[in-house]
Amino acid sequence: MKRLQALMAEQGPDIYPEVIAALKDDPREGAQRLVRQCQTYLKERERQRAVLQRMYNYERQLWSMGYRHIAGIDEVGRGPLAGPVVAAAVILPGEVELPGIEEAKRLSDRRRMELYRRIREVAVAVGVGLVQPEGIDEASVVVATYKAMMKAVADLPVTPDYLLIDGVHLPNVSQPQVPVVGGETLSCSIAAAAVVAKVVRDEYMVEMDAKYPAYGFAHHKGYGTPEHRLALERYGPCPIHRKPSDGTPAGAVLLFTEG
């Protein structure tokens, strides 16, 4: 059994079926535990592959039509009280494996960062666009979202020939596009963009936490948590806080509505 364990460490999951075949009739508890571990791993890998197969349906259809540089686009940061709207655009080279991508918005910070590095490693191109609070205040969060997405597309070092966008139709772009409602669960390209946008925005808010430490931005990333609302009541808004649609500073509105 030690020899098999050494082979597993050396060759990885590809040898798991051989391990299962060699040990399935071995009555020792250690052998059966190893069999169960291999079976569990292989079952989960097959599940992830099936999910990936489904999540490449949009891309696969477009590749078959001759499109090569398909950009998935998503954004994060529409709902916070502070910080920018961030959008990302990602062009993948084909049906690359991105373990955990189907849970892009529910991953732990550590797993999301691992996936982010993997996306950066394999992507044909990655673009990012930010619209700061003053840009949101001047128009609306919807317009800011469009602007961030268009910036992300413009930031791509490779020009996309088709856009897959999470839930919206992007105005004033030359490429053909399709809005995909719930896109981060239906398209790997969109899900990859969601991961990139989330990591970029979170890192930005950690930087802002160092600049404005009273608000706890590193913890809540600008969202309206009790901690954040309490800090707003105590200190008022800082330069990266957004204004409500009537132009009143965020802190003043909170003091009035929660007073």
UniProtKB/Swiss-Prot annotation:
Catalytic activity from the UniProt record: Endonucleolytic cleavage to 5'-phosphomonoester
Cofactor: Mn(2+); Mg(2+)
PROSITE patterns, per the entry: RNASE_H_2 (PS51975)
Matches recorded under CDD domains: RNase_HII_bacteria_HII_like
Textual note on the cofactor: Manganese or magnesium. Binds 1 divalent metal ion per monomer in the absence of substrate. May bind a second metal ion after substrate binding.
Binding site for a divalent metal cation: D74, E75, D166
GO biological process: DNA replication, removal of RNA primer; mismatch repair
GO molecular function: manganese ion binding; RNA binding; RNA-DNA hybrid ribonuclease activity
A single Gene Ontology CC term: ribonuclease H2 complex
Pfam families named among the record's database cross-references: RNase_HII
Segments forming domain RNase H type-2: 68-257
Top EC class for this record: hydrolase
Enzyme Commission code(s) on record: 3.1.26.4
Membrane-crossing segments per the record: none
Family affiliation: Belongs to the RNase HII family.
Biological function: Endonuclease that specifically degrades the RNA of RNA-DNA hybrids.
Protein name (database record): Ribonuclease HII 1
Annotated organism of origin: Symbiobacterium thermophilum (strain DSM 24528 / JCM 14929 / IAM 14863 / T)
